[in-house]
Regions:
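Phosphate-binding site of ATP-dependent enzymes
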Residues: 34-110, 134, 138-140
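A short, polar/charged loop-to-alpha-helix boundary motif
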Residues: 81-87, 151-159
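Conserved metal-phosphate-binding beta-hairpin within the catalytic cores
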Residues: 54, 63-65, 119-150, 160
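Internal helix-turn-beta structural module
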Residues: 151-154, 161-173
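Amphipathic alpha-helical segments that line or abut small-molecule/effector binding pockets
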Residues: 112-116, 168-176
């Protein structure tokens, strides 16, 4: 082990997550270990900037915020190693979407409070989706998506529908919210 790999192993311990900064939908995201780190890093050369972060195992939990209100959460169980682009958009991926999520009420409230706080701290408008990992009884906020997907496979519309808001109503809410912006 030498050079950058040695430094990264000291900072994070493998495995690590490699991802381009300006992409979405997990495009270009890799879970790298010592053995495949260089190979995966080479695949990311086309991107201007990349992020290297600690890999956190655990359950995939997503929380949606609508305006300044907590909307709800969903759990994902991908058949693949993690919820990557193929797990999101391939018809063969068969990622399970679990709603309602089987967690304690206090944990549910905790996740929603963190998602709402992230939404407010980042000065977000409209709809956001915060991605969490739940591991060893703790929630880890991975990121807050300020432009979550709005397709028939997307999570926010699914969460909204579970809580009584159909897709048409969700889109109307977003349009109305946008109309309140003063330019």
């Amino acid at each position: 082990m030498h050079g950058p790999i040695k430094k990264i192993d000291k900072m994070f311990k493998f495995p690590v997550v490699l991802k381009p900064i300006n992409e979405g939908s997990s495009v270009g995201v890799y879970i790298a270990n010592k053995k495949n780190f260089n190979k995966n890093l080479m695949k990311l050369q086309k991107f201007k900037e990349i992020l290297i972060e600690k890999y956190i195992p655990g359950r995939e939990i997503q929380a949606a915020v609508l305006g300044n209100k907590k909307l709800g959460i969903i759990e994902l169980k991908p058949k693949r190693k993690f919820y990557d682009y193929k797990a999101k958009y391939s018809s063969k991926a068969k990622t399970k979407h679990i709603i309602p999520v089987n967690i304690k009420k206090k944990d549910y409230q905790n996740v929603m409070n963190i998602a709402l706080k992230a939404h407010k701290v980042l000065k977000c408008r409209g709809v956001t989706r915060s991605d969490f990992k739940f591991h060893n009884g703790k929630f880890y906020l991975l990121e807050t998506n300020t432009q979550p997907g709005m397709t028939n496979l997307s999570l926010v519309p699914e969460i909204a529908l579970y809580h009584g808001m159909n897709f048409f109503s969700l889109i109307n809410w977003i349009i109305k919210d946008l109309s309140l912006i003063h330019i």
